[in-house]
Amino acid sequence: MNQQERNICYNCFKEKPEGGGPCPCCGFDLEENAAKYPAALRAGTVLKGRYVIGRVLGQGGFGITYLAWEQSLEAKVAVKEYMPGEMAVRIGGLEVQPRSAARREDFAYGKERLQEEARILAKFMGQPNIAGVTDYFDENGTSYFVMDYVEGISFKTYIANAGGKVSTEEALNVMIPVLRALTAVHGEGLIHRDVTPDNIYITKDGNVKLLDFGSARYSLGDKSKSLDVILKVGYAPKEQYIRRGRQGPYTDVYSCAA
């Protein structure tokens, strides 16, 4: 289902005049966003009869994250789609399929990992420093999960805006909430594996959120992929550089210190 015929902006979701060009309210340019992410769902696509897909927030090796509009609550949310570009292709603008029969097993394995991550993250709805999962479902041959949409800036941007460094007090004000979030996550047996400044967000009201859990859960491990596709140089401990390195909560602690 698609709502492209409606004249709305797929960033601020406000009505806009007919015709192309950037939104007069927020300046968002849909054509530019679509050209940047050709493998993404078309803006205006409706998932599960309730989530109107908007602009692409980001794309990684294993999936695409969209801004979306939840129609019943009339609120912005973030929707993650399992779309591993190296092993999958989109058919007819919607359906996601493995590129070949040889990739079918790997595709299914990664899809299961996404579903597992969503189920675990759904347990953290009451944790103030984690963007909780509110829904997950299968559609278009792949899997999706819906998260709180966090408006703010990344800690990476915050540091850059501060001239490349922050005070000890500022660093502690950010990292202590991150450690609280990791304590809850580790208690459920999940390891983040990608604690970096660009995955830590400071919201408009000053709250701190740790995002993008389970990057390594998307890794296909012994099946075909090595962990180097998800580690970030300068933040990853040595066990993440080893194909079968033993990882645990200490992996995240190292990244926090780095």
Q: Where in the sequence are the language-model features?
A:
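AlphaC helix of the eukaryotic protein kinase fold
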Residues: 91-124
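AlphaC helix of the protein kinase catalytic domain
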Residues: 155-166
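Conserved short submotifs of the Hanks-type protein kinase catalytic core
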Residues: 140-154
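Protein kinase catalytic-loop region centered on the HRD/HxD motif
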Residues: 179-190
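Conserved activation segment of eukaryotic-like protein kinases, specifically the C-terminal portion
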Residues: 226-239
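Activation segment signature within eukaryotic-like protein kinase domains
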Residues: 174-175
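Activation-segment/catalytic-loop signature of the eukaryotic protein kinase fold
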Residues: 136
